[in-house]
């Protein structure tokens, strides 16, 4: 068996969960309600207060400096739905940490609550806290140069509106995408017109490889990343001291909003490039393969300001993000930071970033960058040192408990976003892969089969529950969660197993310093108690319009149901008349491949259309039969083959189970 369970089991599970909400909290029927911090958790969090310099308020001064207009309200979409809500986090302000939150994380969450329009210096502004990312606004001779357009059209418009309430209204003459993550380009269409970009009226700068990586990350593995991203950001969890408080580099992600993408018209290809736009001097430093595959820093010589994008935020970053992505190169990352320090350190008075707040003062900037460099170099070198001594990825994570020397006491290197243990595992994965070399781990059972065997070996469900309760009583929540995971995957209808595992996950969430870990624990606990939320807050995405035809067919190859497609061999020619581009698709052995710039003379059918027509069909604004009837799609050959082909495609839903077997 796999992680899948039958629909009948799922119905039984739902019935038992409903019944459990009516039950008394007896030992045999664990409560589904959220719990307070245990005495063990409260004591552990109190201990944190003794070990970190909480009297140091320098970062609060840095975060508040230059504040023109605070923001603590909501952003809504055209339908009146809430997209962004800073008001939900006001419980954090001017209060000591609750015992259900690690005090260090509470400290970071309070800093991320400082939102609004800020003046970095005359003619240079930032909007922070209206989106996961910052919008940096530079006033040129006659217009504005923007660095990053935030995640959504709605938040981008709101950020620019806030700026215009306090500064002269000038046209946007240029946009810079610092890198290929959606929170830095997804709002573009909300504030610039694509026609102006195509006409050259607005310059859009981006690092080399931007479109390939922006689209591949958000489209090809998009559904899986989106679902895992719900766990990482805690977006489905309520806000509060017993729920979601922060995401380390920002508060959470936007909901009910529109992701867009306007293709750049200026690509930065050289390691260092200088451009001047509307009197604003921009010096770009390519940092490909650092925090993103397509990435760059921006130096502003007129201001003596270095913008390190997401390459040196005031928290440890992820070498392998929990939502899923390509593993990042810590050695290269450290090298890029050192190159920035060497080239710009003596010429920089202020360091700004596309998350969080600035670093003020040249000496502090130089120390900050050196510390950031040392941290990523340590992660790489220490993991390699230990793996060459024979330690495996989990052993390495257990061996290294803190950063060396003074690094461990620097607020801006704490594990609020990336975590020390997961980053060390990521380095291991980069060099050696997921397999630890032990043949016992070469071909493990999948979770359902493993769970059943473990439960049987331990003497049955009651014996496992007894062990879980004993572990919880001792504060050994990690062990309780591991035991519970086996039991839930063996028997997802076991309400006591679900409740106990949720309780243990919740206590781990209360204890962790890492915001993403907390969000994942809280989301897991919520879904164990109540199931996967049925509502959809994803909003709309216009990312599909940015797909080139070959990217679109890559996506179809992923969506193809191989089991259904076997025995349906065919060839399909596609002619994009506006692009002057031909593509031949071959379906063979249940596998779809393509040849760009080629047509098969023996194709079953040839499809002629334009890229805008494909965009409409892909967005489900136009169906294929209507397009054929209208003449916007022309067929030559056996048209039934086209319908047969589309009938072989899967659809994906970002509501699949994670903490229990798939349905």
Swiss-Prot record:
Biological process according to GO: dodecyl sulfate metabolic process
Annotated Zn(2+) 1 binding sites: 179, 181, 291, 310
Binding site for sulfate: 232, 318-323, 328, 417
Family of this protein: Belongs to the metallo-beta-lactamase superfamily. Type III sulfatase family.
Source species of the chain: Pseudomonas sp
Residues reported in the UniProt entry to bind Zn(2+) 2: 183-184, 310, 355
Protein name according to UniProt: (R)-specific secondary-alkylsulfatase
Catalytic reaction list: an (R)-secondary-alkyl sulfate + H2O = an (S)-secondary-alcohol + sulfate
Signal peptide limits: 1-28
Pfam families xref list: Alkyl_sulf_C, Alkyl_sulf_dimr, Lactamase_B
CDD domains per UniProt: arylsulfatase_Sdsa1-like_MBL-fold
Additional detail: Is a very useful inverting alkylsulfatase for the deracemisation of rac-sec-alcohols via enzymatic hydrolysis of their corresponding sulfate esters, which furnishes homochiral products.
Function in brief: Alkylsulfatase that catalyzes the enantioselective hydrolysis of secondary-alkylsulfates with strict inversion of configuration, leading to the formation of homochiral (S)-configurated alcohols and nonreacted sulfate esters. The substrate spectrum includes a range of linear, branched or cyclic sec-alkylsulfates. Can use sec-alkylsulfate esters bearing aromatic, olefinic and acetylenic moieties. Acts by cleaving the C-O bond, resulting in inversion at the carbon.
Effect of residue 233 to Y: 2.5-fold decrease in kcat with (R)-2-octyl sulfate as substrate. Cannot use (S)-2-octyl sulfate. Shows activity towards (S)-2-octyl sulfate
InterPro entries cross-referenced by the UniProt entry: Alkyl/aryl-sulf_dimr_sf, Alkyl_sulf_C, Alkyl_sulf_dimr, Bact_Alkyl/Aryl-Sulfatase, Bds1/SdsA1_MBL-fold, Metallo-B-lactamas, RibonucZ/Hydroxyglut_hydro, SCP2_sterol-bd_dom_sf
Subunit structure: Homodimer.
Documented effect of changing residue 417 to H: 238-fold decrease in kcat with (R)-2-octyl sulfate as substrate. 13-fold increase in Km for (R)-2-octyl sulfate
GO molecular function: linear primary-alkylsulfatase activity; metal ion binding; protein dimerization activity
The organism's place on the tree of life at top rank: Bacteria
EC number: 3.1.6.19
């Amino acid at each position: 068996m796999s992680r899948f369970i039958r629909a009948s089991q799922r119905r039984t599970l739902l019935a038992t969960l409903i019944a459990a909400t009516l039950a008394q909290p007896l030992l045999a029927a664990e409560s589904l309600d959220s719990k307070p911090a245990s005495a063990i958790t409260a004591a552990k969090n109190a201990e944190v207060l003794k070990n970190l310099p909480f009297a140091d308020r320098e970062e609060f001064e840095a975060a508040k400096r230059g504040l023109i207009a605070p923001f603590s309200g909501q952003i809504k979409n055209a339908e009146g739905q809430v997209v962004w809500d800073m008001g939900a986090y006001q419980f954090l302000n001017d209060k000591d940490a609750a015992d259900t939150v690690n005090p260090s994380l509470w400290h970071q969450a309070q800093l991320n609550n400082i939102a609004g329009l800020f003046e970095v210096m005359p003619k240079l502004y930032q909007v922070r806290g209206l989106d996961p990312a910052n919008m940096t606004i530079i006033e040129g001779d006659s217009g504005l140069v923007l660095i990053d357009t935030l995640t959504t059209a709605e938040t981008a418009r709101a950020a620019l509106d806030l700026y215009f309430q306090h500064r002269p209204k000038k046209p946007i003459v240029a946009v810079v995408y610092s890198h290929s993550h959606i929170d830095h380009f997804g709002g573009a269409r909300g504030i610039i017109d694509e026609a102006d970009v195509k006409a050259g009226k607005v310059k859009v700068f981006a690092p080399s490889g931007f479109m390939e990586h922006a689209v591949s990350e958000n489209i090809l593995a998009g559904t899986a990343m989106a679902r895992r991203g719900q766990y990482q950001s805690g977006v489905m969890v309520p806000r509060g001291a017993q729920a979601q408080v922060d995401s380390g580099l920002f508060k959470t992600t936007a909901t009910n909003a529109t992701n867009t993408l306007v293709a750049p018209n200026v690509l930065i290809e050289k390691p260092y490039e200088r451009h001047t736009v509307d009197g604003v001097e921009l010096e770009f430093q390519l940092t490909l393969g650092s925090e993103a595959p397509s990435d760059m820093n921006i130096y502003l010589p007129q201001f003596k300001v270095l913008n390190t994008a997401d390459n040196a935020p005031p928290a440890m970053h992820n070498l392998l993000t929990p939502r899923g992505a390509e593993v990042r190169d810590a050695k290269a990352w450290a090298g890029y930071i050192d190159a920035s320090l060497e080239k710009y350190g003596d010429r920089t008075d202020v360091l700004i970033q596309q998350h969080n707040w600035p670093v003020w003062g040249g000496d502090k900037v130089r120390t900050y960058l050196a510390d950031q460099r040392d941290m990523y170099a340590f992660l790489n070198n220490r993991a390699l040192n230990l793996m060459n001594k024979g330690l495996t990825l989990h052993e390495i994570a257990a061996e290294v408990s803190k950063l060396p020397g003074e690094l461990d006491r620097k607020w801006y290197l704490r594990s609020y976003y990336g975590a020390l243990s997961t980053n060390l595992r990521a380095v291991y994965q980069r060099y050696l892969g997921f397999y630890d070399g032990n043949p016992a781990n070469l071909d493990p059972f999948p979770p359902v089969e493993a769970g059943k065997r473990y439960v049987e070996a331990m003497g049955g469900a009651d014996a496992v529950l007894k062990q879980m309760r004993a572990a919880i009583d001792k504060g050994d929540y990690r062990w309780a969660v591991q035991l519970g995971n086996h039991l839930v995957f063996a028997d997802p209808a076991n309400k006591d197993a679900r409740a106990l595992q949720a309780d243990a996950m919740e206590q781990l969430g209360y204890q962790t310093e890492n915001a993403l870990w907390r969000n994942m624990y809280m989301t897991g606990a919520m879904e164990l108690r109540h199931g996967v939320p049925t509502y959809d807050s994803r909003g709309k995405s216009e990312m599909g319009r940015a797909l080139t035809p070959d990217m679109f067919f890559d996506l179809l190859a992923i969506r193809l149901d191989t089991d259904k497609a076997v025995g349906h061999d065919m060839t399909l020619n596609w002619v994009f008349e506006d692009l002057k581009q031909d593509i031949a698709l071959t379906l063979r052995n249940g596998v779809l491949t393509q040849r760009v710039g080629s047509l098969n003379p023996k194709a079953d059918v040839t499809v002629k259309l334009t890229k805008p027509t494909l965009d409409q069909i892909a967005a489900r604004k136009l169906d294929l039969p209507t397009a054929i009837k209208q003449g916007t799609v022309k067929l030559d050959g056996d048209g039934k083959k086209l319908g047969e082909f589309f009938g072989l495609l899967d659809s994906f839903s970002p509501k699949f189970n994670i903490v229990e077997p798939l349905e």
